[in-house]
């Protein structure tokens, strides 16, 4: 760990002259959570990695692809640890920093935890970006951490070809209130906190087709902290949570299904969608990650033959800083919706239900 400003200053001192006002996205082959390694390839890579030590205090590790690690400290406290970083999804450096920080802290909220501390992860093409530009990225991240009530206490930086920014996030949660993605129960209803479509909007932005209103809508959703997860984690009827990010709604719901040894059904008509994203998706705008997501897990999805392609695009659309997906008892659904809506998530909706697996079919996801 190092002093961020000092390290970046020394990197800049040895760099060649930089371009004036470059677009951040021009350096990135992908953007936001859309630059994740495809889920199928990621499983193949991780299958080759040794498991390592699993101490008894480790409550949540890598076994169910959960959002964060959880380590029991004592009878009343567990440490939530996560990291998330990515390449630019937007050109404005301040907005890039805000989006990346919001996305990183979401993993703590998805476990029902309360953030306490962050470390910055910074990779920048020092020869290409002015110090003022890099500073604005850091300012954006710091503004979100102030909103979350936590400090950025340090970090690490490197000189790389593509801009990268994100956080290590640490939080606390009561061991009895950890909300895993593997604890859903048959009969649970599914509540989604944010509308889908951020990936489609980012694709339109990269093509130079997104207008100011569309950009503002995209920014509003991607910089909205999922702080409601702290309250949801205290509800007895909430059984499982995750946040919808790079693998899309279908991919992250399948992780809940597999971890819980269940299946799920989603009502397409109930899904909250970003209005302008629907327009672009109807016109065929999509990220490359959306197709890679479907290729990775489409065999485990029952998709209606008469459903249009644009709906599938939005169900596999990589969400950067997406919403919380909650699996809760039906009796708890009104309180869960109220918690979302009172926290500013106006489009939160019940979108489906968890159910037992059909005989010999394993965990599956059906859209209807």
Feature-to-residue mapping (PLM):
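Helix-biased detector of long, well-ordered alpha-helical tracts
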Residues: 4-368
């Amino acid at each position: 760990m190092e002093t961020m400003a000092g390290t970046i200053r020394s990197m800049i001192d040895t760099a060649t002259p930089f371009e004036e006002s470059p677009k951040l996205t021009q350096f990135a082959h992908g953007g936001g959570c859309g630059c994740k390694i495809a889920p199928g390839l990621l499983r193949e890579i991780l299958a080759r990695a040794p498991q390592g030590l699993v101490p008894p205090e480790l409550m949540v590790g890598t076994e169910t692809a959960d959002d964060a690690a959880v380590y029991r400290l004592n009878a009343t406290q567990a440490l939530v640890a996560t990291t998330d970083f990515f390449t630019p999804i937007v050109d404005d450096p301040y907005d890039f920093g805000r989006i990346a920080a919001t996305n990183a802290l979401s993993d703590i909220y998805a476990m029902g935890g309360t953030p306490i501390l962050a470390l910055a992860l910074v990779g920048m093409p020092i020869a290409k970006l002015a110090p003022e530009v890099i500073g604005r990225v850091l300012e954006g991240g710091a503004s979100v951490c102030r909103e979350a009530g936590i400090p950025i206490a340090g970090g690490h930086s490197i000189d790389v070809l593509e801009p990268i920014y994100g956080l290590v996030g640490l939080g606390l949660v009561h061991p009895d209130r950890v909300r895993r993605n593997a604890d859903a129960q048959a009969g649970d209803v599914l509540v989604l906190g944010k509308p889908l479509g951020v990936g489609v909007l980012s694709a339109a932005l990269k093509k130079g087709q997104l207008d100011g209103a569309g950009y503002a809508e995209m920014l509003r959703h991607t910089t909205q902290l999922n702080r409601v997860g702290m309250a949801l984690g205290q509800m007895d009827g909430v059984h499982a949570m995750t946040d919808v990010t790079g693998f899309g709604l279908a991919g992250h719901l399948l992780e809940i299904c597999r971890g819980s040894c269940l299946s799920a059904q989603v009502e397409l008509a109930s899904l909250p969608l970003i209005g302008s994203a629907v327009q672009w998706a109807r016109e065929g705008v999509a990220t490359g990650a959306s197709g890679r997501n479907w290729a990775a897990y489409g065999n485990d999805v029952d998709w209606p033959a008469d459903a249009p392609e644009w709906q599938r695009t939005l169900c596999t659309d990589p969400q950067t800083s997406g919403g919380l997906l909650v699996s809760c008892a039906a009796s708890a659904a009104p309180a869960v919706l109220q918690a979302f809506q009172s926290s500013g998530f106006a489009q939160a909706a019940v979108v489906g239900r968890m159910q037992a697996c059909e005989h010999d079919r394993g965990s599956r996801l059906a859209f209807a």
